[in-house]
Amino acid sequence: MIASHLAFEKLSKLGSKHTML
């Protein structure tokens, strides 16, 4: 579960940049 949460944070950061574009 914890690993999934960490992966989600990474995707969230990447997604944030993509959303900005």
Swiss-Prot record:
Localization, UniProt: Secreted
Superkingdom as given in the UniProt entry: Eukaryota
UniProt modified residues of type Leucine amide: 21
Keyword annotations of the record: Amidation, Antibiotic, Antimicrobial, Secreted
Main location (coarse class): secreted
Tissue: Expressed by the venom gland.
GO CC terms: extracellular region
Family: Belongs to the cationic peptide 04 (cupiennin) family. 05 subfamily.
Biological role stated in the UniProt entry: May inhibit growth of bacteria.
Identification of the protein by name: M-lycotoxin-Ls4a
